[in-house]
């Protein structure tokens, strides 16, 4: 009877932590910062042998940034999952949270986590995400650190305003002589830039919904919020960029991730649930010569801007496996790699890094009615698809343009409309569990792809009195190489180390006591080493092989003829 009550309590706790989202409100099934913390704590308490939850950083808004460790040992090869860096993309955090839940209760979880570790950061930007749950819902990007975006010596003084009273922030359009936008001929609710080469003249200005609260002629240019964590990492950082922060890692949230990766050499691969993608469309590496043909990554060649060609095959194959596993063959274009965590993990930290956009509107049914066929060269093909998908599947996801009584700009009537806040990035809560299954399956597959340095095959040959040749063949039984080519260049993470330890009275006649291997190819790739030792018969030496992210082994070798 006690067991029945215990199971019932667990079921009730799970229902409270993960509501179904069946009521139909946009926030149903999603967790604000407080409920996210509670859900993680409940999972950790129920699975204390497998799950540890720690606070990685605290945001300016005093909200925790958690890191979840799945698996009992830090020294095992690991995958790091990063989510929630872009505030409006709540779906990434929800998938990461449910991934924690699903990984610990999956069949074979204990066995997988005995040999591997998975780190998950569910929500890197908790401050920005909170506007999803507010009375006024708007896509905030920056954390709670105040910042003077428009450099007028005042912080956060021009926030969005809900002009039509619907509780969400969309866009404003207003006719203007200097307008750059026109209504689309096929779908008039959509706006596109006028093409002067086709004789088109702009009619409208497009602005974020709101008033000019600080009377400087700009609208919502200094909204509440400081640093966009998804733009505060070191690769391709833009100084003075929108919400990018004062300098790379100026935000506690991003700096904590950098410190975590730097101190965890066991992280072999990174999976980013965010706005950048290299799985639907793999990164295209190319040689980009600099001055005098100098390679990237040198003073003359400049910084790395493309994956190294030696890594391309691995990215292509992982992309193929991801698409086969998820059933996704196409998706939205990746966001630019400006200070983002995905490109940073690869270019700066030397890890194989993979990214997914998490969720996006599906393919809309073709509309072949008269006057509804899109042009062959469609400049707004993506927006058109999203609009038609919303009309069929989520009508509230697009707000039709309507005039706002009493709101004029330069004597012209203001209309409000466009895609609803959060609609393009977050599905209904009822879809989150099935969405998580796809991403969890990929993470499980990624763990299986990690490099695996097996205990070496050793042969000992007596070549003379008290003289022995030791030959060791090291094999990588994982799919991925022991280090990415970019990691060999950056020397991050640690390369496979081969160390021969000898004792008193023993002498190393040839071969190096310690050496590093740049990269051992995956899928059974090997590397051979030889030493000649002078030692007493039947004495022993010790061979240490491996790296924190590819596995470590220690072998005692007896020096006798074989």
Predicted regions and their residues:
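Short, aromatic- and glycine-rich surface loops/edge beta-strands on solvent-exposed regions
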Residues: 538-548
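Active-site/substrate-binding loop(s) of hydrolase catalytic cores
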Residues: 76-77, 90-94, 98-303
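Short glycine- and acidic-rich boundary segments immediately preceding or forming the N-terminal edge
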Residues: 23-61, 430, 434
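Bacterial N-terminal signal peptides
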Residues: 8-17
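Edge beta-strands of extracellular beta-sandwich domains
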Residues: 551-561
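Short, hydrophobic beta-strand segments
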Residues: 529-537
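Short amphipathic, basic-aromatic surface patches that mediate peripheral association
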Residues: 474-489
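Metallocarboxypeptidase
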Residues: 52, 64-65, 82, 94, ...
